[in-house]
Amino acid sequence: MMFFIRPQKLIYSPVESFDREVEEQKDNDSRVVVRSTGPTIGLNPAWAVGIVMLLCLSIGSTWAVYFEQRLLFSFKSVNGFVSQWKCVNPATRQEWRTLSGQEKAEYLAAVQCLATKPSRVRNNGTLYDDFPWVHRYTSTSTHKASAFLPWHRYYIQIYENALKDDCSYTGTLPYWDWSLDWEDFSRAPIWGHDNFGSDGNLDAETSVGDGHCVIDGPFAGLTAMFYDNDYYPHCLSRGFKSGAEMKDLGNLVRPGVVEDIMREGNFEAFAQRIEHNAHRFVSGSIRGEFSKFTGPYDPVFFLHHTNLDRLWWIWQMMDPKNRLQEYNGKSNKDTLRRASLDDTLDMGGLRRNLAVADVMETTSDLFCYQY
């Protein structure tokens, strides 16, 4: 059973280009005609002063325009986007099973590449390690809280930027629509040697999170440096559930349940239900890395959260006039303070912190994507 929701499409007005045209200014009266009275040329002092002033203004204006253009065309924002660039043609993120073999291979290679790049936030480790580390570092304010959806929207965008900027990836983040695989998630097309690998090796001893080492696929042999709060080098681990327990977990994301969640009328109710059901399903069914907040060590994490972002986007598009700015609920699970669009999203040093208001629209200049 396929899960389709046909939201109302929001029509965006074209955004005026930020490029500025530079016009050369020429003074047609700039030539000075003087009369010769012999071997020397006489020039009115007032005219001379005027000529000097015009030259100074012209040179100053030329250099000002030059430096302005240099700034406009060389400055990059903290998210890797050129400042004068506007979102005119948003990229479309696609479901994993719809990608070609070449597109899948390019994505997997870019993810592997992150493990070869130096850390941005610590003195050791890799860029790959940074994402689970930051996810754990910020977890108390980004889970069971209103910030869950907006924080992860920005977080996965930073991940996509890293794939592009550091590893030359040219595609977009794919997503995994687990509602298509609710009856037997272990047979989902994201698993297998040519995808993200399979279940952990049941013949080996238990690793972390009731999982075992993944021994097939491009991430076999990957070393995860942290497990929750602890420095604990270990293999990429998974421990698939099966039987009646798996059936119960699958029911959390079956199409009918997801469709019911999409009918929630306010952000707080929608966000709470989507976080509760999706997190219970993924962490309970895959286990291993997903058992703790260092779950981003499993590369499937990003396909999972891109799907959550997709569902939020669909929910927003059902009533864009109101929902593109609708954000409410508890700001943190340990406080009664209400959430605000002015709340800060702490990215743990991966990129500059932003306000929630900055990440509400996926077709903004910051993101420029759709589903």
Task: Give the residues covered by each predicted segment.
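Short, low-complexity, Lys/Arg-enriched N-terminal segments of secretory-pathway carbohydrate enzymes
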Residues: 1-43
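Membrane-interface recognition of transmembrane alpha-helix starts
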Residues: 37-55
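C-terminal accessory segments of proteins
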Residues: 44-46, 50, 60, 66-371
